[in-house]
Curated annotation (Swiss-Prot):
Residues 26-36 form a propeptide. Disulfide bonds join 45-56, 50-63. Residues 1-25 form the signal peptide. This is Tau-scoloptoxin(04)-Ssm1b. Residues 55-67 are annotated as: Highly charged C-terminal region, binds to TRPV1 channel. It is found in: Secreted. GO terms for molecular function: ion channel regulator activity; toxin activity. Its main location: secreted.
């Protein structure tokens, strides 16, 4: 009985270490992924703000000069 409890405890610790969201008490939601994707689409240049006269290109993933 004690041996099986120890084995179960080890597996539970390994499981929680693999999925840290489960031990934080937060719900796992697919909306987090959507938020991350929308943040990426709003600024695909890895968080870099483009200088004045330039815009961030989704295709090139870099700042390019705005066309007039």
């Amino acid at each position: 009985m004690l041996k099986s409890f120890c084995i179960l405890s080890v597996f539970m610790v390994l499981f929680l270490a693999k999925f840290p969201d489960l031990c934080s008490g937060e719900e796992i939601s697919p909306l987090k992924i959507v938020v991350r994707n929308s943040e990426y689409l709003n600024n695909p240049c890895n968080g870099v703000t483009c200088p004045s006269g330039y815009r961030c290109s989704i295709v090139d993933k870099q700042c390019i000069k705005k066309e007039k």
